[in-house]
Amino acid sequence: MKREWGKHEHIPASCIYFCNGTEEAVDLIMRAFALFNRDSVVAAVPTRTVYARRAAVNRLEYREAALRPSDFELQAETVLNAVSETTQLVFLCSPNSPTGNLLDRGELETILQLFDGYVVVDESYIEFAPQASVLELLNKYRNLIILRSFSHGWSMAGVRFAALVAYPEVIETIERVGMAHPVGAATLSAVADVVKHRLDVDKWVRQIVDERTKVRMALSDLKECKQIYHSDANFLFVRFADSAAVYRYLLKQGIAVHPVQGCLRITIGLPNENSALIGALRKR
């Protein structure tokens, strides 16, 4: 399986570790490279809650570095200022959730160059912007760990499958804290079948990207919609005149979105689901 997926992504099998979803991947990284009750981790926020959650479980101090408020861009100086003597890991999500934007590569490289610990780039949504992957940086930085998920672009959320990609010595350290047989045969078989049909996955991703454009255009016509941030993921981050009221209204209509910092994270679904969302907002 490592050879098959690695062939698609141009990654040697020795640089790959498979595990049961993003939550386990983050947990393994923390257990491998940070000591509980002593070390800390930094994350650029707003971002996924999994980093804070696993830090708490592993008794690690969780430190936040704010993305630039105007456009949620990564700023290396802010991240490095959040780092302390106990910081072993920096977590960056690109495309970022919930904001949807890719993080600036130049800023990322500055962090990789100046931070002594490991930088984890979570590319769980990278299938929606494959040209932006930082995989090639593995040849340059031994302190880079890349996290990939099969939940979004691969549409296998129920399978709970993820991959960690890093320098072989890093993978060996992760293997020492992981289970002897981390992923079951049934899961590997299901994933292998999807990997063999990569063209179908690419078709699905293109459909989501097309739908994202349509939803964005429809939202921009609404008077209540004040700002739609650029997205390279399978969702949009939208600011409404009263986002809290819109959130409550949609919930009553049976439509679930995620409220974050005065905005709503809206997942792009099937065409009929997107039409239902826009239809409900137009009636408000």
What is the role of each PLM region?
Residues K2-V41, N58:
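Phosphate-binding glycine-rich loop
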Residues A32-R54, R68:
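Conserved PLP-anchoring active-site segment centered on the Schiff-base-forming lysine
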Residues V45, E64-P69, E123, Q261:
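Short beta->alpha connector loops at strand-helix junctions that form conserved
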Residues P69-E123, E127:
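Active-site phosphate-binding strand-loop segment of PLP-dependent enzymes
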Residues G106, A244, Y249-H258, G262-R284:
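PLP-dependent enzyme catalytic core of the Aspartate aminotransferase-like
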Residues N143-D221, I228:
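PLP-dependent aminotransferase class I/II
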Residues L147, Q227-S231, V257-P259:
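Short beta-strand
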Residues I208-V209, L219-Q253, L264, I268:
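Conserved PLP-binding catalytic core of the aspartate aminotransferase-like
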